[in-house]
Amino acid sequence: DLNVRFLNKDEYERWDSIVAALPSASIFDESKWLAAVADVMGCDIRILGVFDNDRLIGGAPLNISNKFGMPTATGIPLTPTNSCIIEPLETIFSSKATNYLLKITDAIGRFLQSNYDYAVVANHPFISDIRSFNWLGWRTQVLYTYHVDLAKADFSALPKERRKLIRKAENSGVIIERSDDFSAAHNLLAKTFRRKD
């Protein structure tokens, strides 16, 4: 049986190592991002962990609050998903990998149902099997997103209006670059919300 509980802060490094190993994960799944959003937004963000014995194998970040006296576990502000994160399973058998995924998502779903009156988990597009949530009676909705490799993208195939917006951004000096500098994102968020005070 799997054990499900919230991680202690000293376990965040292990969480981050699982996130780093996943091609589907992003900065929005990292504990530093979650801590920065919690700080800027003044909310209680926790990472739910799923353990096989003492080994962390998955989980999900959640915004914990009380709404109208009801405990809730929902998505993270300023963050596109609060996806289930699943440690990769080394196997050549797709059925074994599917069962592993379903076992972990079932544990997450059951924990949330047992402890919260309302819960939201918005998975990455790479979590393509949400049957565990369906079987538990959750209201589920599959939404679609597209991933475009910009280096290989054929911009001539884009609609005219989209090409116009891209050219306008380029002419305005907008550039996109990969960065591991977390402080840049944190500073931008802090400035954004400071202006609204």
Predicted ranges, named:
Residues 2-81:
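Amide-forming acyltransferase catalytic core, primarily the GNAT-like/NAT-type
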Residues 16-19, 109, 186, 190:
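Non-transmembrane alpha-helical segments in soluble domains
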Residues 1-12, 132-197:
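Acyltransferase donor/substrate-recognition loop-hinge adjacent to the catalytic core
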Residues 67-140:
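Acyl-donor binding region in acyl/amide transferases
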Residues 49, 58-61, 118-123, 175-178:
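A structural signal for short, well-ordered beta-strand segments and their strand-loop junctions
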Residues 53-54, 89, 149-153:
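Short loop segments at secondary-structure junctions
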